[in-house]
């Protein structure tokens, strides 16, 4: 194999390693709990990457981020596996 092919292979492997998440969970699971801008009091769940658990929080009803699940089952299915 020529050195050009080896260099190309090394580059592709490096790119693949950079694009592959360290864990299998989506990046949204790393976001902090965010209640949003409104003042509703909606029981919701988020994945806490520090405790590695889905935890309850109160969602305000608008805004926030994607780490916001209606049920603990949905949170587990998405972020715990």
Swiss-Prot record:
InterPro entries: Kunitz_BPTI, Kunitz_BPTI_sf, Prtase_inh_Kunz-CS, TFPI/VKTCI-like. Expressed by the venom gland. It is found in: Secreted. One of its GO terms (cellular component) is extracellular region. Keywords: Disulfide bond, Protease inhibitor, Secreted, Serine protease inhibitor, Signal, Toxin. The keyword Secreted applies. Disulfide bonds join 29-79, 38-62, 54-75. PANTHER family: KUNITZ-TYPE PROTEASE INHIBITOR-RELATED. This is Protease inhibitor 3. The lineage of its organism: Eukaryota, Metazoa, Chordata, Craniata, Vertebrata.
């Amino acid at each position: 194999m020529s050195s050009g092919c080896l260099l190309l292979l090394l580059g592709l492997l490096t790119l693949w390693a950079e694009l592959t998440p360290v864990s299998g969970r989506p990046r949204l699971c790393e976001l902090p709990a965010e209640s949003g801008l409104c003042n509703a009091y909606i029981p919701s769940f988020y994945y806490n990457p520090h405790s590695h658990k889905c935890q309850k929080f109160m969602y305000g009803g608008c805004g926030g981020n994607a780490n916001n699940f209606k049920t603990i089952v949905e949170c587990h299915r998405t972020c715990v596996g």
